[in-house]
Design a protein with these regions (language model features):
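Catalytic cores of the polymerase beta-like nucleotidyltransferase superfamily
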Residues: 1-451
Length: 451
């Protein structure tokens, strides 16, 4: 036990005091203790207590309660719009589905409750006046930057297969390594991830990929991750001899995720880019050939990768915007970019500035995970030049019908009949403007429309 002081939110402190004043023991527990000790701001404050669900309901009957977890001992109370989960100390029964206990047994012992938790860094509790309760070495593992299972790792993963991905997510989120015994048990149990619902797999993978240390975690634990995404296994050890690459396909993909610069991207853009980069070369093992010079070639891996990424993302039940956004980027991630204004304007017309900014971010990350050669540096300079000019033209150029100095009503006013011909004429005018053969000026456009 440590006498360190953790500053609790007023509402969490109030809940603890109410439970304790009624004769129950109660502590904040889990991630909020871990994050507080790391100097991070906890997102949630969970409470464990000797109080049974009926006792909690009676104590907080004047508050709004959520009772969906009551059979497992959890009562959530809503204070100032924020839920606080309070859970009775418990022992878990067997886990026949590798996800949920078949039954739970309520107990009065905090130590028994902490023993059932996943990792030592999540198995600490705290109460004012008592300090941090750390029975399984969580603090030393925080100091050593290690994710370690409580007790026997194989048992923890047999109880709940999703803990395998949780271990990787914590590795990526915190920049921690897996304890060797924990990593070995996770690898041995990776196939049990097939028993976990697609939605839960997606949520954990998404959290991993969006974490700051995702690249390093992917590089270290690809074989474990293949239990959730089997398609990555052929990428591990798939070599890329030649002047462009210094990594195999998997290590390259991991390095690209780590190299992503997400500044300026909105929430959806961040997610789309993380997943697109993760899967951008997923089909390379299927397309690999070796030329007479010994260099590896991957003809068609863009399109085939887009198809395979769509299968993976749909299987994981990813949101539609993510599926379409990531697949669209993968399909063209290795395609050359135009250097001339006409080509850039036409690309803006087809794809839009948001897509092209995402594409540049993916291309930068992809190239930064290549070999450090003059050829790669030249390609990166080409992307930078394209991005600069594209951003300029996105602000000042004309590449959509709405940006034309005339509209359909203007064309009908000069005698063009209503119908498909109006749209066709506008498209012709837009093409001429993008080609640079016609200025985007009202009189010039109207004159061209009647020719």
């Amino acid at each position: 036990m440590s006498r360190d002081t953790i500053r609790l939110p007023h509402d969490a402190y109030r809940l603890l005091q109410t439970l304790r004043a009624s004769g129950h023991s109660a502590y904040v527990v889990g991630g909020c203790v871990r994050d507080s000790l790391l100097g991070r701001l906890p997102g949630d404050w969970d409470i464990c207590t000797s109080a049974r669900p009926d006792e909690m309901k009676a104590l907080f009957c004047s508050q709004r309660l959520i009772l969906t977890g009551e059979k497992h001992g959890t009562v959530a109370v809503i204070l100032h719009g924020k839920p606080y989960e309070m859970t009775t100390y418990r022992l878990d029964g067997s886990y026949r589905d590798h996800r949920h206990p078949d039954n739970v047994q309520f107990v009065d012992d905090l130590a028994a409750d902490l023993a059932r938790r996943d990792f030592t860094i999540n198995a600490m509790a705290y109460a004012p006046g008592e300090g941090v309760i750390d029975l399984y070495g969580g603090r030393s593992d925080l100091a050593a930057r290690v994710v370690r299972c409580v007790g026997t790792p194989a048992d923890r993963f047999a109880e709940d297969a999703l803990r395998i991905l949780r271990a990787l997510r914590f590795s990526a989120k915190l920049g921690f390594a897996l304890d060797p015994a924990t990593a070995a048990a996770a690898l041995a149990a990776r196939d049990t991830l097939r028993t976990v619902s697609a939605e839960r797999l997606y949520t954990e993978l998404d959290g991993l990929l969006l974490a700051p240390g995702a690249g390093q975690t992917l590089a270290q634990y690809g074989e474990i991750l293949s239990g959730a995404v089997p398609e990555i296994l052929p990428c591990i050890g798939c070599t890329q001899p030649g002047k462009w690459h210094c990594y195999d396909v998997w290590q390259h993909s991991a390095a690209a995720v780590g190299a992503l610069d997400l500044r300026g991207q909105d929430t959806r853009g961040v997610r789309v880019l993380c997943w697109a980069t993760f899967l951008h070369d997923i089909a390379k093992p299927l397309c690999r050939s070796v030329g007479p010079d010994g260099a590896a070639h991957f003809k068609g891996h863009n399109q085939r990768g887009a198809q395979l990424a769509r299968v993976i993302l749909r299987r994981l039940k990813a949101p539609a915007y993510l599926v379409d956004g990531a697949v669209g980027l993968i399909a063209v991630h290795d395609a050359p970019l135009p250097a001339d204004d006409v080509g850039i304007l036409k690309l803006l017309n087809r794809s839009g500035a948001i897509f092209l900014r995402r594409l540049c971010a993916l291309k930068y990350a992809d190239l930064d995970a290549h070999a450090n050669t003059p050829e790669v540096a030249a390609r990166r300079a080409d992307v930078a030049a394209f991005e600069r000019r594209m951003n300029e033209l996105a602000k000042t150029g004309c590449y959509t019908m709405r940006q034309l100095a005339v509209n359909g009503a203007d064309l009908m006013d000069i005698g063009i009949p209503a119908g498909p011909g109006v749209g066709a004429t506008l498209q012709t005018l837009l093409n001429d403007v993008m080609e640079g053969t016609l200025p985007n000026e009202r009189e010039a456009l109207l004159a061209a429309a009647v020719k």
